[in-house]
Amino acid sequence: MAEGFAANRQWIGPEEAEELLDFDIAIQMNEEGPLNPGVNPFRVPGITEAEKQEYCNILQPKLQDLKGKIQEVKLEEGNAGKFRRARFLRYSDETVLSLIHLFIGYCPHLCRRHELGSLRHDIDIEALQEERYNDREKGITDNIKYGKRCLIGTAVLYLLLSLGIIIHTCKAQVVWRLPPLVVPVEESEIIFWDCWAPEEPACQDFLGAMIHLKASTNISIQEGPTLGNWAREIWGTLFKKATRQCRRGRIWRRWNETITGPLGCANNTCYNISVIVPDYQCYLDRVDTWLQGKVNISLCLTGGKMLYNKETKQLSYCTDPLQIPLINYTFGPNQTCMWNTSQIQDPEIPKCGWWNQNAYYNSCRWEHTDVQFQCQRTQSQPGSWIRAISSWKQRNRWEWRPDFESEKVKVSLQCNSTKNLTFAMRSSGDYGEVTGAWIEFGCHRTKSKYHTEARFRIRCRWNVGDNTSLIDTCGETQNVSRANPVDCTMYANRMYNCSLQNGFTMKVDDLIMHFNKTKAVEMYNIAGNWSCKSDLPPTWGYMNCNCTNSTNSGTGIRMACPRNQGILRNWYNPVAGLRQSLEKYQVVKQPDYLVVPGEVMEYKPRRKRAAIHVMLALATVLSMAGAGTGATAIGMVTQYQQVLATHQEAIEKVTEALKINNLRLVTLEHQVLVIGLKVEAMEKFLYTAFAMQELGCNQNQFFCKVPSALWERYNMTINQTIWNHGNITLGEWYNQTKDLQQRFYEIIMDIEQNNVQGKKGLQQLQEWEDWVGWIGNIPQYLKGLLGGILGIGLGMLLLILCLPTLVDCIRNCIHKILGYTVIAMPEVEEEEIQPQMELRRNGRQCGMSEKEEE
């Protein structure tokens, strides 16, 4: 072939070959960017003449072809050129490979890599080839063909995956955590409650400033237990709170008493009673206004439960302010009576019809108090005269001081009334066995020049005397035995003597408490000249009954009706009154979770983060989201997250309103309550934390999917007919799917009990504590010193190891900034380096100046 070239063509030498290869490289680089044009071998540094001649022999056909192209082929704009063709093929190969790596993977490429990017023409044909290609010829390469197949196959694959996900989602069950729904509590559930009363020390342990946070709603709640079901427990707890400070203080007297039965102590009929007599000074200071009902008390629920007012259709955490007297009263709040006594099963329900001798009081009605009492004290016996310390304006004077330590002292007041009052007297007294008939009313002495401000609760016993006082006999009929007189009328504007009650006994649970009132006279200086006007609460009244004489004839003289009407004494029952006030409050709760179909996930907004004060503003949720009978389950899902976003704004507005009113204490109470409710919500939300993590649900998600294996194992199939694509209220859905909620609770309990991962985690934590437990015994300063030494040593070690890499990184950055390009030179063994070797750089010989080379 060399002879053929020599006969027909001129031999191309090294110099011309170098120029032709430079031209070839330039052509490749000028056509739409570089295509890895390669290196001109004649410009390799250190090449010898013999090597150049050898290159010329090897590349002679290539060089002749290049020379022919320069002479024959005219490069026009429409001529694509084979380099542009090769560039198209290579770029298309890269595109297809990228798609394959992206959608399918690298394994199919390794199996069929020999078919990708191959040309469909013979490059050894010597005939001049037309350098024009149409679109059809461009489209016959394997890379484009397989690229189309890859695109279609990937689309089909993703379509199948999408269908599978949709089908799986349709079958999934979703747990809606803390749904905007309230349901009645069960009868067996335990409620935790507390009281809130402003400026009342016995009730300050619960700061309920948010009692006014209410929202109207038309939600229909099925009947459940009311707060009145716990009236007895609430009353007992309130009384303990009211007397807590007194029971902590001094004990006036303590004794043990044995009550024997009809047969003595036979058959275990003896009862040992421990009686505690607290100091009445504490009672009068801290509890008197409470027992009178002057303090407005609100009962508040804790533990995430709320109150639903069946009259106002409102939700709240606390009741409206209530006046709760803790002992029996003649004057007190309104209390409903039951007439058909045969149907009364609860002994606490008041029976507003009773017999006393021949008199039968019935047809009772509550009347508002429109009467005032005026009382004054002039003198009491025994006692002594003492000389009062005088000032320079006054002369020395003597004042009477009673002997308060004497048991003979009997303090009496002279009182009159502004209205005729006929009292139906009977033997029953306060809670417990207290004999005598007492009538009580509050008295308040205003501050004057000679008297300080004082409040005293007067309780008079009118059936003690020897017919010498004006009202002690309290009746005109004589010889009445084993019963109090019935004719006990207090006429208007007539002065009566009133013997003060010196004590009374109350029983709370198993504790019998006796309150001694003898010290009260000394405390409020009643022994001196003392007068007052009654200050009964304006909302109080009394029970006025009709009196009918019995037709039954009995032995002895029995009292008949003195008047056609009479006021029941000790009529008000505190437990029954509290129960009546609380019957309108139904105890409800927010469910921890609600099992719904996976369809709700399609309507769920993007915001997934849960507001931690969801419990605080649940009433706002219900009112704003419209949780009434017209709100469907799907509609609640779409609006729930939007409502949650407004909670913080609502709380800030309430706080700002409190600040405007300068209620600093209430603002502090509000903040404390918010923190407490947040803690309750956090505890409720994290109650099933481990189980929810096993289900793939964290604490910031409201909607969590239940794995299909679990709901199939526990048979949690949802009735799609009842669901009806969400066209059902949440309340109806909850009531009809209680079995689903119970089964999900079983799932949580099983996961909690069988949490092997949790046990392993605790075991690993214990092992880790055993390994590093000795650190806790090291003093704090030694820990700091040891930590500093270890930190410095570790930093120096990292600096030594990473220093070369850091230097190279800095050098490369500097080269990039200055525009240098780093070229990696091939390694040459030292014995091959010759001193006479000439190195060419950019077409010049190394070691020669430009002038010498010219």
UniProtKB/Swiss-Prot annotation:
Side of membrane Cytoplasmic, spans: 805-854
GO molecular function: structural molecule activity
PTM annotation, UniProt: Specific enzymatic cleavages in vivo yield mature proteins. Envelope glycoproteins are synthesized as an inactive precursor that is N-glycosylated and processed likely by host cell furin or by a furin-like protease in the Golgi to yield the mature SU and TM proteins. The cleavage site between SU and TM requires the minimal sequence [KR]-X-[KR]-R.
Residues at the site labelled Cleavage: 609-610
Annotated region described as Immunosuppression, given as residue ranges: 660-678
Swiss-Prot/TrEMBL GO biological process terms: symbiont entry into host cell; virion attachment to host cell
Pfam families xref list: Env-gp36
Extracellular side: 1-783
Ranges that cross the membrane: 784-804
Glycosylation sites: 218, 256, 267, 272, 296, 328, 334, 340, 416, 420, 479, 497, 529, 546, 549, 715, 719, 727, 735
GO cellular component: host cell plasma membrane; membrane; viral envelope; virion membrane
InterPro entries (UniProt xref): Envelope_glycop_lentivirus, GP41-like
Domain of life: Viruses
Region described as Fusion peptide: 614-634
Alphabetical keyword list: Cleavage on pair of basic residues, Coiled coil, Disulfide bond, Glycoprotein, Host cell membrane, Host membrane, Host-virus interaction, Membrane, Transmembrane, Transmembrane helix, Viral attachment to host cell, Viral envelope protein, Virion, Virus entry into host cell
Claim: RNA-binding is one of the keywords in the record: no
Keyword Coiled coil annotated: yes
Coiled coil: 641-691, 734-770
Function of the molecule: The surface protein (SU) attaches the virus to the host cell by binding to its receptor. This interaction triggers the refolding of the transmembrane protein (TM) and is thought to activate its fusogenic potential by unmasking its fusion peptide. Fusion occurs at the host cell plasma membrane.
Subunit and partners: The mature envelope protein (Env) consists of a trimer of SU-TM heterodimers attached by noncovalent interactions or by a labile interchain disulfide bond.
Protein name in the entry: Envelope glycoprotein gp150
Species annotation: Feline immunodeficiency virus (isolate Wo)
Gene behind the chain: env
